[in-house]
Amino acid sequence: MTRTIDPNTTMAELLQEFPGAQRALFRAYHIGGCASCGFDGAETLASVCARNDNLPVDDVVNTIYAAHEADQKMQVSPGEIAERLRAGEQLPLIDVRSREEWDAVHIEGATFFTQELMQEMMSEWPKDREIIFVCHHGIRSLDAASYFAGHGFQRVRSMTGGIDAWSVEVDPDLSRYHVE
């Protein structure tokens, strides 16, 4: 169940429940993308709205909910991906984690996301090709999927829970890790 957002919700609580909120706030209102328009996790949504041209909190909340709904449509579970791979589907799993994370552990058959791969995808891959992005917990991959969707890719997905969920739900032999 999705948590209700109210004016006193802190930004940390908001981002915990709605990971795409920062992306949505930046896209719609230029909030949270840089030092001059950033916010502190302890600030409430109401205070952030107040210092950004007194934005109506209800409008901002609706923007976050709409973005969250769009994000949910891009999600695909580790179990569904595993089933499809076992059935022989050729799914591009694009891992957007850091090189260190990739070197430590990665899903067999996944491809490490590089600048060169991004250029290839943007210029050569069909816009209707299904692409599944993977990261540690499913947040960076959701940002990547959203970015590619914004550039016209129609079938981008993000693996819910990332490689961490994959290691719990699909492949318990895959090491779990924590970034400090």
Regions found by a protein language model. Give the residues of each.
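Rhodanese-like catalytic fold shared by cysteine-dependent sulfurtransferases
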Residues: T2-G32, G38-L91, R99-E130, I139-E180
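Phosphate-rich cofactor/ligand-interacting catalytic cores and adjacent structured alpha/beta frameworks
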Residues: D95
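Short, surface-exposed ligand- or partner-binding patches at beta-edge/loop junctions that are enriched
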Residues: V134
